[in-house]
Amino acid sequence: MTRRLRRKNIIGGRVAEARKAFNPPLTQDALSGRLARLGIQLDRAAIAKIENNSRHVLDYELKAFSDALGVGVNWLLGDEKK
């Protein structure tokens, strides 16, 4: 079941892709700081788990990732181009 879930969960990969698209790339710690300024407490380890698809993303976290990374929620969900 985990293997099946991983194929369907694209948010983690999109978070990593958006984070690395910054110049210079955002570190997971820097992203954690951006999220904290938005009121979301996720440390580097939690972000790593999300990017590795071993932790689910809650709806309010999805919105915060969108704001912190400057990408649309739909893009994070795989529905549109960056």
Model-identified regions with their sequence ranges:
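A short, Lys/Arg-rich alpha-helix, primarily the initiator
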Residues: 1-26, 30, 74
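Short amphipathic recognition helices of helix-turn-helix/homeodomain-type DNA-binding modules
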Residues: 3, 63-69, 73-82
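Short alpha-helical elements of helix-turn-helix
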Residues: 13, 29, 45, 59-62
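Short alpha-helical DNA-recognition segment
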Residues: 24-50
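DNA major-groove recognition helix of helix-turn-helix
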Residues: 35, 51, 61, 77-80
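Residue-level recognition of specific faces of alpha-helices
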Residues: 46-49, 56, 75
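Short, basic-rich loop-to-helix N-cap that marks the start of a DNA-contacting helix
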Residues: 52-67
